[in-house]
A protein has these predicted regions:
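Substrate-binding/catalytic cleft of secreted carbohydrate-active enzymes
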Residues: 1-176, 180
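Surface beta-strand/loop "capping" patches
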Residues: 183-190
Length: 190
């Protein structure tokens, strides 16, 4: 990375934080995703934490891992799997899932659609989600802290959303997902 590129990144990263600082829904700053342009990770994570100590810092979601920031974040597709743990930080699965289901007439690009794993019916896609959720629930006792499903909606040529690109059709059984997600959230209740 050139000095000019680094300076631009730092300037723009500060602008992002300044612009979004007052949004209480933001709980974590994530300066890098999947090692795309990742550089001086420890320095950037430390600066971010000093600049806004009120929020968690995820130094690199699914990227090259360093022992800095508040969490260790892995990506694994399609099913959830954790192959690293950190006893000093939250261990999270920043991306998993990608359950593809093509619904004609609700596609951004009808001739190009992709998912990590493809199914033909809502029932099949729901069953796969429930299977993954069961795996997540079992991982909690091993120190697993959080997960982010890819993804809420279809986007452009990716058909792995829980709802279609146009937001008109929910592609899975909402009640079954709510039930399993609630059970995961309550799994640590005594």
């Amino acid at each position: 990375r050139s000095a000019e590129s680094e300076e631009t990144y730092r300037k723009e990263w500060k602008e992002v934080i300044d612009c979004l600082y007052s949004y209480p829904c933001i709980g974590t700053w994530v300066p890098f995703n999947e090692a795309w342009g990742q550089f001086k990770t420890q320095e950037i994570a430390e600066w971010t934490k000093q600049y806004d100590p009120s929020r968690l810092v995820n130094p690199a979601s699914g990227g090259n891992h360093y022992t800095c920031g508040d969490m260790l974040d892995l990506h694994h597709y399609p099913g959830p799997e954790m192959f690293l743990y950190d006893a000093q930080r939250a261990t999270v699965l920043g991306e998993y899932g990608g359950i593809g289901l093509v619904l004609k007439d609700h596609l951004w690009e009808p001739n190009r659609n992709w998912g990590y794993i493809q199914f033909n019916t809502s029932a099949e896609a729901t069953a796969e989600y429930l299977k993954y959720a069961g795996i997540l629930k079992d991982m909690i006792s091993r120190g697993f802290s959080a997960a982010v499903y890819t993804q809420t909606t279809d986007v452009e040529v990716e058909v792995n959303g829980l709802m279609t690109y146009d937001r008109k059709v929910i592609k899975v059984d909402e009640q079954k997902l709510k039930k399993i997600n609630d059970s995961i959230c309550r799994s640590l209740d005594k």
